[in-house]
């Protein structure tokens, strides 16, 4: 998602850094089609790529040589990062790239300076991690984003203090903790979240290797995202290529895809969400422990509550549920279909049925397993009555976790009210509304 232009670090700001960036692209070997233009006008947000002429499917928009990519393998301190790779290992695998960015972004002679000029001040990134905590909770309670941000901030603090800071102190000729601060590091984490690319592994490597490290791809990261995108990035041995996937008329914006992302993921990682009904990949979550809570509330006596506890423990052993897990609901089906199907079935068993099920170690005959594994909307409406009731109660409990109901959200979407909302309020509204629509759709299916 392209961000607004920002303040330059050194000399006065360039009112239009685009020309300098395009010149840099040409010098770096980036091939930009004459049928496209980089612009801040006519885009959904910040910089974007516009069609300067009609485009057909399969047309090359640009190609970026691998030598122009900014990564731990191409930066000025690549040898240093290679030698220290064991000490730079982290859960996120982002640390080497972040160190490369810390160095290149604050070095006036960096070969990527014209690239950074498009993002002159990362403080204008508007991910929820930069919102005041009170605002984050008020606008996003129930969406899953506040919890994800809390984890991010804790990991950023830990990574900076335990890996980044010791590395910088051991290389004082390159890094300065007073310049390369935690705040800058946090901004660069958001920059990598929003703009980096990870090359997919070859199929034969998927089981043996971890994910490829992220990298920055000039020009490719300018494209904005929509679920119904019209361009796609291709990875070739010597370059990365952006190619059209459908006809695009002159003047239209060209969109890439960041993958099948729900609105809460888009806002969390990229700082924006798609208005309803644009995001066909949107989802809503029911926390697994919420289903347990609903089952316990339905228990009529202590013996039934004990049975629910035993059933839950068995589901944990089967790795169908976990204390921090969630069942994921899409517009047309349950994405965690096996987990939800088995959980509903087990929690609705009588004591005798559960005893027999345990003796079979959770196995069932193929026909029964196949019948219960696919939870499309049609299949949800055909669930047995006890499973429907348990799922219905679980949805009601989930809806209670938000601060407002669906009707209140619909009132906010009226044009006169919506236009008066702040950008953050609008983006949060898109997330909440999509989730609640999916949950209410499920209520109707199992009512």
From Swiss-Prot:
<dbReference type="InterPro" id="IPR011383">
    <property type="entry name" value="N-lys_methylase_SETD6"/>
</dbReference>
<dbReference type="InterPro" id="IPR036464">
    <property type="entry name" value="Rubisco_LSMT_subst-bd_sf"/>
</dbReference>
<dbReference type="Pfam" id="PF00856">
    <property type="entry name" value="SET"/>
</dbReference>
<keyword id="KW-0808">Transferase</keyword>
<protein>
    <recommendedName>
        <fullName>N-lysine methyltransferase SETD6</fullName>
        <ecNumber>2.1.1.-</ecNumber>
    </recommendedName>
</protein>
<dbReference type="GO" id="GO:0018026">
    <property type="term" value="P:peptidyl-lysine monomethylation"/>
</dbReference>
<dbReference type="InterPro" id="IPR050600">
    <property type="entry name" value="SETD3_SETD6_MTase"/>
</dbReference>
<dbReference type="GO" id="GO:0032088">
    <property type="term" value="P:negative regulation of NF-kappaB transcription factor activity"/>
</dbReference>
<dbReference type="InterPro" id="IPR015353">
    <property type="entry name" value="Rubisco_LSMT_subst-bd"/>
</dbReference>
<dbReference type="InterPro" id="IPR001214">
    <property type="entry name" value="SET_dom"/>
</dbReference>
<comment type="function">
    <text>Protein-lysine N-methyltransferase.</text>
</comment>
<comment type="similarity">
    <text>Belongs to the class V-like SAM-binding methyltransferase superfamily. Histone-lysine methyltransferase family. SETD6 subfamily.</text>
</comment>
<dbReference type="GO" id="GO:0005634">
    <property type="term" value="C:nucleus"/>
</dbReference>
<dbReference type="InterPro" id="IPR044430">
    <property type="entry name" value="SETD6_SET"/>
</dbReference>
<keyword id="KW-0489">Methyltransferase</keyword>
<dbReference type="Pfam" id="PF09273">
    <property type="entry name" value="Rubis-subs-bind"/>
</dbReference>
<feature type="domain" description="SET">
    <location>
        <begin position="34"/>
        <end position="259"/>
    </location>
</feature>
<keyword id="KW-0539">Nucleus</keyword>
<dbReference type="GO" id="GO:0050727">
    <property type="term" value="P:regulation of inflammatory response"/>
</dbReference>
<dbReference type="InterPro" id="IPR046341">
    <property type="entry name" value="SET_dom_sf"/>
</dbReference>
<keyword id="KW-0949">S-adenosyl-L-methionine</keyword>
<dbReference type="GO" id="GO:0016279">
    <property type="term" value="F:protein-lysine N-methyltransferase activity"/>
</dbReference>
């Amino acid at each position: 998602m392209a961000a607004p232009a920002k303040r330059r670090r050194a000399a006065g700001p360039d009112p239009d850094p685009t020309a300098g960036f395009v010149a840099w692209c040409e010098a770096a070997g980036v091939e930009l089609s004459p049928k496209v233009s980089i612009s801040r006008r006519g885009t959904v947000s910040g910089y974007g790529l516009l069609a300067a002429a009609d485009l057909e499917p399969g047309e090359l928009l640009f190609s970026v040589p691998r030598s122009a990519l900014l990564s731990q393998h191409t930066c000025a301190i690549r040898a240093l990062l290679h030698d220290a790779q064991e000490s730079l290992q982290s859960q996120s695998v982002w640390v080497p790239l972040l160190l490369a960015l810390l160095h290149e972004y604050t070095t006036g002679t960096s070969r990527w300076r014209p690239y950074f000029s498009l993002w002159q001040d990362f403080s204008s990134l508007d991910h929820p991690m930069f919102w005041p905590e009170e605002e984050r909770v008020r606008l996003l309670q129930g969406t899953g984003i506040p919890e994800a941000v809390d984890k991010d901030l804790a990991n950023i603090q830990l990574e900076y203090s335990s890996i980044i800071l010791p590395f910088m102190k051991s290389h004082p000729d390159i890094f300065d903790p007073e310049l390369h601060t935690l705040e800058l590091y946090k901004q660069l984490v958001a920059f990598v979240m929003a703009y980096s690319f990870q090359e997919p592994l070859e199929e034969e490597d998927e089981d043996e290797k971890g994910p490829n490290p992220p990298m920055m791809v000039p020009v490719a990261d300018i494209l904005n995202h929509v679920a119904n995108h019209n361009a796609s990035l291709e990875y070739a041995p010597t370059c990365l290529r952006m190619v059209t996937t459908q006809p695009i008329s002159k003047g239209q914006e060209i969109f890439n895809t960041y993958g099948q992302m729900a609105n809460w993921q888009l806002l969390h990682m990229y700082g924006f969400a798609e208005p309803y009904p644009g995001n066909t990949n949107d989802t809503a979550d029911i926390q697994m422990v919420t289903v347990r809570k609903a089952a316990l509330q339905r228990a009529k006596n202590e013996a039934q509550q004990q049975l629910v506890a035993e059933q839950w423990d068995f589901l944990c052993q089967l790795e169908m549920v976990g204390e921090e897990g969630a069942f994921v609901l899409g517009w047309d089906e349950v994405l965690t279909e096996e987990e939800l199907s088995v959980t509903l079935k087990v929690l609705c068993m009588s004591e005798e049925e559960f005893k027999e099920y345990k003796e079979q170690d959770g196995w069932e005959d193929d026909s029964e397993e196949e019948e219960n594994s696919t939870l499309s909307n049609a299949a949800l409406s055909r669930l047995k009555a006890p499973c429907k009731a348990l799922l219905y109660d679980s949805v009601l409990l989930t809806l209670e976790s938000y601060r407002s109901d669906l009707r209140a959200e619909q009132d906010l979407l009226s044009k006169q009210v919506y236009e008066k909302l702040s950008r953050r309020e609008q983006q949060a509204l898109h997330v909440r509304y999509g989730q609640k629509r999916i949950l209410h759709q499920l209520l109707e299916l199992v009512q």
